[in-house]
From Swiss-Prot:
The chain crosses the membrane at residues 3-23, 25-45, 72-92. NCBIfam families: PRK12660.1. It comes from Staphylococcus epidermidis (strain ATCC 35984 / DSM 28319 / BCRC 17069 / CCUG 31568 / BM 3577 / RP62A). This is Putative antiporter subunit mnhC2. The keyword Transmembrane helix applies.
Amino acid sequence: MNLILLLVIGFLVFIGTYMILSINLIRIVIGISIYTHAGNLIIMSMGKYGPHMSEPLIQGHAQNFVDPLLQAIVLTAIVIGFGMTAFLLVLIYRTYRVTKEDEISALKGDEDDE
């Protein structure tokens, strides 16, 4: 299971890097979102998980608990990532409405504009 999770995280990092290096602004935002998901998986993989683990809410005697702190951190990271993605999409939308361009190379401007 750890090998599969490691391969999924590596694949997400690869795809995120590929998308961030493109010149289209929407692809860059999608790449940043994929990086966020890869980071969340890395944080979740640090905790103990599996079918033999139990919730920390059991009244009786339980030995193996899942760490709830990592789940809280990932939940917070998901909310922050969603807010960041929404802000970047609105920023790109506004930039497109003003400049009619959605590529980074077109947004550099001319040398005469300085």
